[in-house]
Amino acid sequence: FDQAVMRKPNRSYRRYQQIAELVNTAVREKADMLVMPEACTPKEWLPTLARTCEKNHLAVVTGVEHIIEDNCVYNLTAVILPYEEKWTGQWHSVILYHSKNHFAPEEKRMIESLYLRAMEGIESSEAECDAKYELYSWNGFWFTVYCCFELTSIRDRSIFQSYIDALIAVEWNQDVN
C-alpha cells in the first residue's frame, strides 16, 4: 500500500512469481474460483491473468493495487470471469471492476497525508455518492464482492440478502495476514 500510494509500486519478478504460483496452484487443484487479497495485483498484470483464466476456466477475484490518477487514489477489486462463446465454442474472459465504496479511516488519513484524495465508490462530482455494489452470476453461482472496510456497514451487507450464494470479501489487514 505505502509503495503504491507513494508512486513506487513493486513490479519485481519475485512478486510476479508469487502471484503466478497462487494462480498455478488453483489451476492444478482444479479450483473453480480463486480469491486474492485487497491491493494484491498490479493493474498491468490483469490482462495476463485474464488469459490464464479463460484458458483454464478459472474465475478470479483480486484486489487491484491502488491506482493514482490526477492526485486521486482508487481502490478497485477486479472480478475476472471466463465464459464460452456459444456460437464458436471459444473461451474468453471479461474483467469487471468494483470501486471501493468506503475507505478505512486510517487508510483515508494516510492517503490525505500525501495530499491525495481517496475516491470512494463511483464519484461523478464532489458530492458523496451512494454505495454501489455489483451482483455477479457465474455458472449458476450468484455472488457479490465487498472490499475490506465496506463490510462494516450493516446496511450495505444486507443489500443482497436472499439473492446471493456468497458474499466475497477481499481485504488486507495486519490482523488477518
PLM regions: where:
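Long, hydrophobic, well-ordered secondary-structure blocks that form the structural core
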Residues: 42-43, 52-55, 60-87, 97
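Active-site catalytic loop in hydrolytic enzyme cores
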Residues: 72-161
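CN hydrolase (nitrilase-like) catalytic-core segments centered on the catalytic cysteine
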Residues: 40-65, 142, 151-177
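Short, flexible loop segments at the rims of nucleotide/cofactor-binding pockets, characterized by
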Residues: 9-15, 36-40, 121-125, 144-150, ...
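A local structural micro-motif
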Residues: 34-35, 61
